[in-house]
């Protein structure tokens, strides 16, 4: 690959065709992440008949990369896309395992506020149900519920620097408003996440203790102490750091006596999230912090992430969330060059631990676990990003649907997408 990019070769060596359905890749160096889906080896293919006619420097801005045009691969081909609304799939007549049993699949974006009534009416066959509405949907009789731990989490992050495009790396600002680790830890200990999960999400969402999720059972440290609700400890941390209430108004000032106001941003989601955002503000006020909602309201999701990715200087703290994929390597999200390192926090210790996780030494299982535990403890101690809610995803499946499970399209699945079928022309109601 290197010789090809440097113009020393007109082809990429190390790619071997085994048969019509198998390709073997030869690497100069092996990394532990290669043992996992998505870890260092792309889980997608690029259609040569499309990209051969587009200059490489234009790939990133091309319609096929930006999603304006789509080429499908698998049991179904993409028939049409309505941006932000729906995707229609049709059976791939040439699928190597045989023609799918369904002629067409229509995926639509539906408001969480409407999905319960839509499923009750039989308007959709499969839907992920909003945890906050569990009481409203739990007794539906025309569906079967399947559940699995969702490999994703919500978090509170602190804006600690910027992404330097010219250098292609994150640069931490030692003078950032949230630079004091005691301030960050205090904001974590102020939150009663388990109570929020119970009251707002019916216990289907709950707190976690680490940025490595239980989903990664081989390296997750279940014994690590997380940021459990402890407002007294939060107050003590702030006192020790020099954030004190000097004028008796119940709110703490900066160490130099100036007014401390923290701007907090959150994306617009559902009613439960709106309640949670307001509760965050109240919990932080209880420990003496003046935290104000940036713009006075939550922000539409696309606009929110644009502000985060461009390091809006007016945002000090933000609540967001993401899926974790199948490779737990923290360098993917928190490394020096990781664009998704939205807190922009980098230090030598963290970088060194991540190098160990990505080293050949980590092929040793015991060493791998040791390195991951070390990074989890480091991340908790530095509190650049605090995990809040994880949970179980509940999927409602209409009773006419056959051969569906929560692990479909993964190696653990007993069902494959092309086998999915329905037993009647109309949905159960």
Where on the chain are the PLM-derived regions?
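Surface-exposed binding/hinge segments that line
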Residues: 1-53
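A bilobed periplasmic-binding-protein/Venus flytrap-type ligand-binding module shared by bacterial periplasmic
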Residues: 90-93, 152-182, 199, 392
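Append "and occasionally in soluble cytosolic enzymes with long acidic Gly/Pro-rich linkers
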Residues: 90, 177-282
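Detector for C-terminal structural segments
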Residues: 93, 188-220, 272, 276-282, ...
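Ligand/substrate-recognition segments at binding pockets and active sites
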Residues: 83, 244-321, 393
């Amino acid at each position: 690959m290197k010789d090809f990019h440097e113009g020393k070769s007109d082809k990429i060596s190390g790619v071997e065709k085994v048969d019509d359905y198998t390709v073997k890749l030869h690497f100069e160096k092996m990394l532990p992440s290669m043992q996992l889906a998505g870890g260092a080896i792309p889980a997608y293919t690029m259609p040569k008949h499309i990209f051969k006619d587009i200059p490489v420097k234009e790939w990133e801005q091309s319609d096929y990369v930006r999603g304006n045009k789509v080429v499908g691969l698998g049991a179904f081909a993409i028939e049409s896309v309505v941006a932000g609304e729906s995707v229609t799939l049709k059976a791939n007549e040439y699928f190597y395992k045989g023609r799918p049993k369904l002629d067409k699949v229509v995926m639509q974006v539906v408001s969480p506020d409407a999905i319960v009534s839509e499923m009750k009416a039989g308007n959709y066959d499969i839907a992920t149900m909003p945890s906050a509405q569990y009481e409203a949907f739990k007794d539906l009789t025309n569906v079967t519920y399947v559940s699995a731990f969702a490999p994703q989490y919500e978090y509170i992050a602190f804006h600690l620097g910027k992404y330097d495009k010219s250098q292609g790396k994150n640069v931490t600002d030692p003078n950032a408003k949230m630079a004091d680790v005691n301030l960050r830890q205090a904001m974590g200990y102020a939150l009663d996440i388990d109570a929020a999960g119970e009251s707002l999400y019916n216990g289907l969402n709950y707190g976690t203790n680490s940025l490595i999720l239980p989903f990664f059972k081989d390296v997750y440290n279940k014994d690590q102490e997380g940021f459990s609700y402890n407002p007294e400890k939060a107050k003590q941390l702030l006192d020790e750091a020099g954030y004190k209430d000097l004028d008796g108004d119940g709110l703490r000032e900066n160490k130099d006596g100036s007014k401390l106001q923290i701007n907090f941003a959150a994306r617009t989601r559902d009613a439960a999230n709106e309640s949670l955002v307001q509760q965050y503000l109240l919990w932080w006020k209880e420990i003496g912090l003046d935290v104000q909602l940036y713009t006075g309201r939550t922000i539409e999701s696309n606009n929110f992430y644009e502000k985060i990715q461009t390091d809006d200087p007016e945002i000090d703290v933000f609540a967001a969330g993401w899926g974790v994929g199948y490779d737990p390597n923290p360098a993917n999200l928190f490394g020096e060059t990781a664009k998704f390192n939205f807190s922009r926090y980098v230090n030598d210790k963290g970088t060194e631990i991540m190098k160990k996780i990505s080293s050949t030494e980590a092929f040793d299982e015991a060493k791998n676990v040791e390195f991951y535990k070390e990074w989890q403890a480091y991340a908790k101690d530095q509190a650049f990003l605090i995990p809040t809610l994880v949970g179980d995803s509940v999927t409602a499946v209409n009773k006419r649907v056959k051969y569906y499970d929560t692990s479909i399209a993964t190696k653990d699945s007993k069902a494959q997408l092309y086998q999915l079928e329905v037993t009647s022309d109309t949905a159960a109601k």
